[in-house]
Amino acid sequence: MNDYIVVKCGGSMLEQLNDVFFDCIKKLQQQYKVVIVHGGGPEIDAKLKDCNINVEKRDGLRVTPKEVMDVVQMVLCGSTNKKFVMNLQKHNLLAVGCSGCDGKLLQVQPVSEEIGYVGEVSYVETALLKGLINMNYIPVIAPIGIHDNEIYNINADTAAAGIAAALSAKELILITDVDGILHEGKLVKKTDESEIATLIEKGVITGGMIPKVQAALASLKMGVQKISIVNGTKDFTEDTGECIGMTVTRGVSIV
């Protein structure tokens, strides 16, 4: 059990998770060392609305001045992270919640001044993750990072990809609420970066699946070797630890 697996669960999925999801995490933990990264977009947007703070997005990223960053930190590192940890432990999965600023876990480079406190992962302190795992805990990471003693928001997909690449993880698993992509009436089980562009052009990949495959492509560029996009509301893990869903790698032909 030397291989690492990183599981990314978006904020919109957190309220949909059922017993099946936690059973799958247990199966993964029997075969691999598991790290979980979560988002929190819907809860952040709701809290910003409650605070009467307007939200602007550019290229899919939330513009994050200081007042927005304070809310993002409060939600991700507070309620969202702790509720997820408690849910895992309710299902007998020992977990420790932390953010990327704890122990300088996730160090970032700012994306741009125009977008505010938004960063991209530049360094991962893997010793902290390995230490928690060696004590039989599942690290549950809120995607917040640090740069020059300031706290930055990180897109959860890229945070998960950065962690997976730093750990040389066997696989990054992206949790969704759909089974995958249908091509000519069949579920696509394997694809690669070049064929994803073809499938988008043909209209096979549409709607909400487009950002998911784009996240997979970005992960490949960061050095992750294998990304699985799975339906977290169903059994997505074999007893062997293999995922049931769509796998994105390099050089696999399906079209």
From Swiss-Prot:
Q: What is the catalytic activity of this protein?
A: N-acetyl-L-glutamate + ATP = N-acetyl-L-glutamyl 5-phosphate + ADP
Swiss-Prot/TrEMBL GO biological process terms: arginine biosynthetic process via ornithine; L-arginine biosynthetic process
User: Matching Pfam families, A to Z?
Assistant: AA_kinase
State the CDD domains in the record: AAK_NAGK-like
Q: Where is this site: Transition state stabilizer?
A: 8, 212
Q: Record's family?
A: Belongs to the acetylglutamate kinase family. ArgB subfamily.
Q: Per its record, how is this protein called by name?
A: Acetylglutamate kinase
Give the metabolic or biological pathway: Amino-acid biosynthesis; L-arginine biosynthesis; N(2)-acetyl-L-ornithine from L-glutamate: step 2/4
EC code(s) of this entry: 2.7.2.8
**What does the protein in this record do?**
Catalyzes the ATP-dependent phosphorylation of N-acetyl-L-glutamate.
Gene Ontology, cellular component aspect? cytoplasm
Gene3D superfamilies for the chain: Acetylglutamate kinase-like
User: Which UniProt keywords are listed?
Assistant: Amino-acid biosynthesis, Arginine biosynthesis, ATP-binding, Cytoplasm, Kinase, Nucleotide-binding, Transferase
The residues that the entry says bind substrate are 40-41, 62, 153
Location in or out of the cell: Cytoplasm
Q: Name one GO molecular function term.
A: acetylglutamate kinase activity
